[in-house]
Amino acid sequence: MNDSFDTLVDDVPIAKSSIHGQFVLKYFEGREKELDRIIEKGLERVKVAGRYTNKNGKPLYYPPGTVVPVRVGEKTFYLLALTHFRGNTVEPNMKIYYTAVLTLLEYLNKATAGAPVYIPLLGSGLARINREKENELANLLSILRMSRVKIVGGIHIVLHPDMRGKVNILRYRKNKSIL
């Protein structure tokens, strides 16, 4: 998700094809105001990092790694401030990416109570962190290893079916030391 937790999916700045856009459309289409209220409540105690002056969507933005839990039925989704904008374009930044993922892991370590955690390949696609899917996976696994945070139920990285053939999963399954 972006650092202003936008809920308007109109392809500027939130694309329908992004994980962010797909989440909003699948679980809150037509109920974006409800999601806005949940997000606002989740951000009540978070200090605003700044204000956008030239971006469509919400003007306030929050620190990288800010997490807002959103309960949908029996599932809890953890919305993550991962991307920052320059105008209406995502500004790729590895430092923000690393900070956000490490902060997410620390949050999940406290919040998940031993439940397994499923995360998408963060930074793929529209976040423009890395164009090569193999490198994105290697980066994410590297952060998981460096963090030393142990999620009791395990962390499962979910890859979109379109990534078949773009990521050599066997390379990582064989080398358990990466995790």
Task: Set out the residue ranges of the language-model regions.
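Macrodomain-like recognition of ADP-ribose-binding/processing modules
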Residues: 1-179
